[in-house]
Amino acid sequence: MFWYSSPVFSLNGNIIIQGDLVDEPCSLQIGSELQTVKLGNIIKNTLYLHKRTVNYPFYITLETCDISDKHQVEVSFNGEEDILQPGLLATAGTAKGIAIGIKTEEGNKAEINRTITKYELEGGNQTLTFYAYISASDAVIEQKSITEGDFSAYVSFMLSYP
């Protein structure tokens, strides 16, 4: 008797499982930690007429909040600040004369690298709403020197529980 056996091929892979064990009252919903806010096409004349665009919402969602020990969350935003418009984000790209601002749901300015906005924690899940907008400085508007092109900015946020 003759037995023929074909060779067996196998592929190996690796899986990394990771996380953080923390002493915080809430966890951050997956997807909240890395977001892209798409602003689309902004018409330059909108900035000359109104100095800024409409608000574009984005959300930070907290999950499974346990308020038995801590009752507030503080949110701060950090990034490269615009030179002409302090408190707003500087942009990268070919567009010039603009900066990106952030506002709270209540309409208060969340200044980059300084403002800490406080929220009362609710038990369970809670969504914090913020808005991004494009702004042009008074000098750029007066000189009609906005340059069209692509733009982007990177901002990080920090949650702390006092």
Per-region residue spans from a language model:
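Mature extracellular/passenger domains of Gram-negative fimbrial/pilin and adhesin proteins
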Residues: 4-162
